[in-house]
């Protein structure tokens, strides 16, 4: 697939690619069906947009974005997991997410922890936040990391907030996420192949 995707990017073709076995959480077939490196690999191809929407509502916006593309291929990653539609703190999230990321759970402007999460890890982060008492936790859905990083610094700071600690949650390799955290222990990623089910 990679050679044809690269040619589509070079040719500025608005192809849409769907990746169905996203994440390491499913896949009784083991590491052959757990694409831990795919997110990073797709993000590094020039002129390719890679979307990893968190729930069904984000997926609808991702489809809109893909259909609006006129000069680059769009890749969307979906999972076989059952993901619930969650409430969004940002009431204008449908527009904000078009800049790559938006706030799902607010916390405050000065959260103790900001969790940057993608796809099924957004719901996982929301559930994890419920288990932590006494902490002000902001959760951000990063549907398009590359697009988010193209935004001006003030927007990025507004989304991440003045958190004492930033944590990343993505079911893939940590490549490209290191700059957001102060310690590797805050990377909830996987830098190895999975195991058989």
Name what the model sees in each region.
Residues 1-40, 58-61, 68-197:
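Thiamine diphosphate
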Residues 15-19, 49-53, 73-77, 137-140:
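Acidic/polar loop patches that form or flank catalytic/metal-binding clefts of enzymes
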Residues 21, 56, 143-145:
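Residue-level "edge-of-site" marker
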Residues 12-15, 47-48, 164:
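Short glycine-/polar-rich loops that comprise or flank the Walker A/P-loop
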Residues 53-61, 65-69:
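Conserved glycine-bearing catalytic or ligand-binding loops at nucleotide- and phosphate-handling centers
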């Amino acid at each position: 697939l990679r050679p044809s995707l690269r040619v589509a990017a070079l040719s500025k073709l608005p192809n849409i690619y769907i990746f169905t076995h996203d994440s390491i959480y499913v896949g009784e077939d083991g590491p052959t069906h757990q694409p831990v490196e795919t997110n990073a690999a797709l993000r590094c191809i020039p002129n390719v947009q890679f979307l990893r929407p968190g729930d069904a509502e984000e997926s609808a916006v991702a489809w809109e974005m893909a259909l609006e593309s006129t000069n680059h291929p769009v890749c969307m990653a979906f999972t076989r997991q059952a993901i619930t539609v969650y409430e969004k703190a940002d009431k204008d999230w449908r527009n904000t997410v078009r800049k790559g990321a938006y706030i799902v759970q607010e916390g405050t402007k000065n959260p103790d922890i900001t969790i940057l999460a993608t796809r099924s890890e957004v719901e996982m982060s929301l559930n994890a936040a419920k288990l932590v008492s006494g902490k002000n936790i902001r959760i951000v859905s990063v549907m398009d990391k590359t697009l988010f990083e193209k935004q001006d610094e003030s927007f990025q700071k507004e989304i991440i907030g003045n958190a004492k600690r930033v944590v990343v949650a993505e079911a893939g390799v940590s490549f490209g996420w290191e700059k957001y955290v102060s310690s590797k222990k805050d990377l909830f990623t996987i830098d190895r192949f999975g195991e058989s089910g």
